[in-house]
Amino acid sequence: MDRPAVVLLSGGLDSTTVLAIAKSQGFTPYALSFAYGQRHAVELDAARRVATALGAAGHVIATIDLTVFGGSALTADIAVPKHDTVEDLQADIPITYVPARNTIFLSYALAYAEVVGAGDIFIGVNALDYSGYPDCRPEYVDAFQAMGRLATRAGVQGTELTIHAPLMQMTKADIVRAGLALGVDYGMTSSCYDPDAAGHPCGHCDSCLLRLNGFAEAGSTDPLPYRGA
């Protein structure tokens, strides 16, 4: 039986792993990505590669303009913080947090799910190596799921929405191991918040450091060509 599911796909390590997990669990994945004015728009090229390579049944890239609000180093003229080690990452919510981004993305996913007849949505949020983002916590996902069941025609008519966050309690190393076990080629992904024009990752933003640390702890080598490496 066909089990359609919407998978939020940025083109990064986490969302790519989630797409592979959804497929391994027997779902027919419909990928959803966003061109939201992010400075690291190279991730959309990665999302296209990933969706094709992992056999998504459909791939929508929705265009929304979050630069009208700004408020983040990813959508405004604000420098992306750089560090030398994972230990240097700040404990509070960083300036790379995009206001309400996951709420906006999940709202679009609700609409896409209704159109393709999906009762399942997958998102790659993580509560352990998550850089302090408030919309990556378990209580947030639970609350949005409850709202989604009330807010859609499908929910009212009896289709029970489930939001899957399979990476929630995994370390970045766990995520890397899981993806490699499923045959994911991480060389086609993009995680950096501040890549150069050729798409090479900086190696020093929060996302790069967490990714590199994850590969190191997993006993593997990140296949991406980092600047200056």
Swiss-Prot record:
GO terms for molecular function: ATP binding; ligase activity, forming carbon-nitrogen bonds; zinc ion binding. GO terms for biological process: queuosine biosynthetic process. Keywords: ATP-binding, Ligase, Metal-binding, Nucleotide-binding, Queuosine biosynthesis, Zinc. It is an enzyme of class 6 (ligase). The gene is queC. Its cofactor is Zn(2+). It holds the Pfam family QueC. Zn(2+) binds at residues 192, 202, 205, 208. Binds 1 zinc ion per subunit. This is 7-cyano-7-deazaguanine synthase. Belongs to the QueC family. CDD domains: QueC-like. Its EC number is 6.3.4.20. It comes from the Bacteria. InterPro entries: QueC, Rossmann-like_a/b/a_fold. It catalyses: 7-carboxy-7-deazaguanine + NH4(+) + ATP = 7-cyano-7-deazaguanine + ADP + phosphate + H2O + H(+). Catalyzes the ATP-dependent conversion of 7-carboxy-7-deazaguanine (CDG) to 7-cyano-7-deazaguanine (preQ(0)). Pathway: Purine metabolism; 7-cyano-7-deazaguanine biosynthesis. ATP binds at residues 9-19. Signal peptide: none annotated. The keyword ATP-binding applies.
